[in-house]
């Protein structure tokens, strides 16, 4: 009888726990960069109505929610300042080639070619040559009308 080699490729408890920890950190970072989906937004033609009371993320400056439109594009509604004039709406398609931008730090980035935009859509770095498209916004009480 010879000595048999153990070819079992099982993982140690430590390597499993390290893997779980790395996964948790990765998921929490991704969630921190994701915009909250707007609650109760309604689209009628080219107008969108949003209830501020249902979208608590817009209560503080820097807060934002995302609205996915019927045409496949997305908008970000952003609290840029206090008061009724402190709400902005931008299209989340890069102005370079139309690729959806993603939340990156305190702004937006195009994953295709690296264009960078501020939180309110201003162009920071190309190859895009213009800011993200903005939409007119009016606020009456708790109601936001976009478009």
Walk through the language-model features, giving the residues of each.
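N-terminal secretory signal peptides and thylakoid transit peptides that target proteins
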Residues: 2-27
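Short aromatic/basic micro-patch
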Residues: 10, 49, 88, 111, ...
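Short amphipathic alpha-helical/adjacent loop interface patches that line ligand
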Residues: 20, 62, 114
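Hydrophobic membrane-targeting alpha-helices
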Residues: 28-32
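N-terminal pre-ligand scaffold of iron-sulfur
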Residues: 33-95, 99-104, 134-147
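Short cysteine/histidine-rich metal-coordination sites, predominantly Zn2+-binding motifs
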Residues: 108-114, 124-132
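Short, acidic, Ser/Thr-enriched surface-loop or helix-capping motifs
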Residues: 118
